[in-house]
Every structure is written in structure tokens, then in C-alpha cells.
């Protein structure tokens, strides 16, 4: 079977983020359903996030030949499916730890490699990345809403069934042959050494500290919001809709970002994100009333999207190979490592503080206001 390359790419994003829309909001619910404590759930989720960090940092850069991108996606999707199936094999904590690490290690490089494929194809034929990537966000909304509805109708066991189905669909989509194969010169790996990486961190430590705090503050939300809201009386379906609302707000801001932030610097945008973080996590710890939860979820466009846009703007202002290296550090550390570490702490804090964990997240976001890097122009 052959599929037009743009549609092939859109299908890849759709099936990946459909699966991620099941895994990210509801995996803690599945872990709780099989009898694990919040402390253990935090450890498992944290281990998974560390594996995501390592997968993105170590596996994705290994694919230096653009013509091998599709083969790499197929292999990684197959390995991800094998580990998804392995979740069915047992509920012992040691086994779950092993499977969580393997699943996330191979699941995480799929997006950067798909993005690399999109960049390669943009050089070969006209491709509107935004319109293609949008299907990933749409799929996340569908995945989280559908999972919430089915968990309400049945029970937590439907989560693993849907995840397995989603990953299998992703593999089947990747096995379809696109009309145009990726082509391009093999990218030679730069021999930068530790000194270059350390110099990069020293030069950009304020930026990295700021985004690590802002993204890391999402840990309690990613790991325990579904459990917290269900304990407050909301159905799994309602939880799915709330998560979907956050992604809808995210998509809207992505679509309007050029108009909204045209005159803002990365420093200004990081301030906006930090303020949204303090407000969002403070409200989340204070109340579970539905009107306020709607506000909390709309603020996702500030805590996540504006922070990510600020990071992209800051990185784009760097020169030469520094752009590539700083992008790698940002993706691995801010989007992976900081959330992984904070998720482990969030598990302990939720065990003993309950909703108070979200007030701690507000405190985590607060220092970002003062650590922002000095860049120009200002809005």
C-alpha cells in the first residue's frame, strides 16, 4: 500500500499523539487501578521520564542518514509495541519498572525523528509543517477524551487496551510506503567534546534553569491530576475533557503565536509563563470547583505553550552549531529530565500533602521570574 507523503506524515503524528493522549493523562490511573501507591506511581513515572530523556538524547541523534529515517521509525514503533504488550504480563513493581523504562526509551525518539523527516521532506517538496503537525494535537484531544469516556463506562483496564491498540496502529501506519522517500546527505556528527557542552550550559544557565523550573512544575499535573480530580468526584470522562481543553488552548496559542507575541522577546514570554504557572498551580491546589478547573486548563497555554515558544525564540537567536546543541539540551533536560526528577518528588509529596503538591509546584515556578535571561528586544 502506498500513501501520499504528506498524509503519511500526518498519520504518523496522529497515531503517535493519539497514543500519547492515552498514556500521559491516564497512565497514573492505570497504575493506581492495579493497586500501586502514589509513592510507587511517582517512582515509575519518574523512571519513565528519565528513559524518555535518554531516548531523545541518545537514540534520535544516532540516525544521521535521512534515507534511514523511515526504517528507524518502524523499528522504534515495533519495539514500543513489544513493551506495550509486556505491560499485560504482570504487575510486579520490578517488572513494571523494566517495562516502563523500555517503553519510554523507544517511544520518546519517535517525535524528533518524525520532525527530522518533515524537515527533510520540506527540502524535497512543498510541505506545510504546521498543517501536518496540527493532526497530532487533534489526536491528543481525541485520545484523552475517548479514554476518559471509556474508563467511565468500563474501568481502568481499558487504558492499557487502548494504548496497545494505539501503538499498533502507529506501527501499521509507519509500515505503509510513502510516495516520496526521504533523501539527503548524511549528517556528520560534530566532535564537540564535554568542554563545548559545559561552555554551552555556562553561557545559557539562566535560560536552562528558567525553562527547567517552568516545565518541571508540570510534574504533579502530568502525574497526579487525573487521580486528584477523580478523588474530588469527577468521572474519568470529565478528566479526559479537562485534559482536552488544555490541549485545545495550546493549539489556539500555537496558531496565533506570531500575532500575539510578534513584539515580545523570549524574556518577556518567560515572565508571562512564570506568572501563569504560579496562578495555575496555586488555583489547582486551592480548589476543585469546575469553573476554576476550566480556568486552570485554559492556563495550560501559558504554562506550557508560551514557555515552549519562548524557548524556541531564544534558541533561534543563537549562532551556528550552538542552535543544534542548545536545542538538544533543552529537549532532553527541560522537557525530560526536569519533569522526571520533579515527578519522583511529586509522588512523595502527593502521598503526604495531597492537593498541597500543587502549591509546591507554584513555588517551583516562582523563581523563574527572576532567572530569566537578558535578551532584547522587549515588548
Curated annotation (Swiss-Prot):
Task: Provide the species name.
Answer: Escherichia coli (strain K12)
Cytoplasmic face residues: 1-4, 67-70, 119-129, 176-207, 257-266, 313-323, 376-379
Family of the protein in this entry: Belongs to the major facilitator superfamily. Phenyl propionate permease (PPP) (TC 2.A.1.27) family.
Which Gene Ontology terms cover its molecular function? lactose binding; lactose:proton symporter activity
- Hey, which stretches end up on the Periplasmic side? 32-37, 97-100, 153-155, 228-231, 287-289, 352-354
This molecule's function is given as: Probable permease involved in the uptake of 3-phenylpropionic acid.
Q: Does the keyword Cytoplasm apply?
A: no
Query: How is this protein named in the record?
Result: Probable 3-phenylpropionic acid transporter
